[in-house]
Amino acid sequence: MKIGLIVSRVDEASIGIWSMLKGMVKFKEINTNEYSSDLALALVSDKDIVYVDEADEWARVNDIDLLLFLSRHEMKNPKPLITFHTPGNWTNDVELGGKPGQVAISEPRVLTNLFREAYRRIGELNGYSVTLEATHHGPFVDKPVVFVEIGSTSNEWRDPKAQEFLASLVFDLLNNTDKYINDGKDAAVSIGDLHYTTLVNHIINGEYDVGHMVPKYIKPTPTIIKMAVERNTVRPRIGIIHWKSLDAESRVMSEKELSNLGLTVIKRR
């Protein structure tokens, strides 16, 4: 698997993780913005991470199989947090980059196994917790993508221990790709969950890997359901509907669409 790293110079967490990773992997500078090594390529941009649209063309030209965006995380009620997610916009709102109504390709196995590995190690990072987020924000990339993030204030973004923690996870992925890819688990999509998943115990217990997650604040449509299922590296077999979060119409539609697409439906009540 050919992996590409996307770094933003204006993102304190991003450039910090990148600096730590360069201490673990011998990268050669190709030009001002590009680096290569035996384990990965890297693109370093002056843009904020959600607006690095050139990552799409760069990944295509370099035949990249998986992109990892190294990023900061922000939230309304800040707390120390390590988080992972797929980028994309379910609606036409592109305030945070990307394209209207388009999502990147999710890599359920890598996304979920990075989370599992971080969850296993999080005791090393005093005061932090770890989670998976719903699919949100840009940029749009027509390649498998995982965002790896440090949250949620400049104190954490600049925290060398948090930067080293994520750099070590990325280093483990680069050196042990098979561990993250060949786990033999079914993939799932999630409809109607909170922005920060409530499926942690099911995921940690290995019941399934999770790709795209459509949060409760997005009203699902047949188009959204189809994108959530089809924009994955592996075909999901499980569709999880968070029953109480959806109105009656959305429940019926989501169950019907997931079933028609061949998924086994789990209703979380």
Swiss-Prot record:
<keyword id="KW-0479">Metal-binding</keyword>
<dbReference type="Pfam" id="PF04414">
    <property type="entry name" value="tRNA_deacylase"/>
</dbReference>
<dbReference type="GO" id="GO:0051499">
    <property type="term" value="F:D-aminoacyl-tRNA deacylase activity"/>
</dbReference>
<dbReference type="InterPro" id="IPR007508">
    <property type="entry name" value="DtdA"/>
</dbReference>
<dbReference type="GO" id="GO:0019478">
    <property type="term" value="P:D-amino acid catabolic process"/>
</dbReference>
<keyword id="KW-0862">Zinc</keyword>
<comment type="subunit">
    <text>Monomer.</text>
</comment>
<comment type="similarity">
    <text>Belongs to the DtdA deacylase family.</text>
</comment>
<dbReference type="InterPro" id="IPR018033">
    <property type="entry name" value="Deacylase_DtdA_archaea"/>
</dbReference>
<keyword id="KW-0378">Hydrolase</keyword>
<dbReference type="GO" id="GO:0008270">
    <property type="term" value="F:zinc ion binding"/>
</dbReference>
<comment type="function">
    <text>D-aminoacyl-tRNA deacylase with broad substrate specificity. By recycling D-aminoacyl-tRNA to D-amino acids and free tRNA molecules, this enzyme counteracts the toxicity associated with the formation of D-aminoacyl-tRNA entities in vivo.</text>
</comment>
<protein>
    <recommendedName>
        <fullName>D-aminoacyl-tRNA deacylase</fullName>
        <ecNumber>3.1.1.96</ecNumber>
    </recommendedName>
</protein>
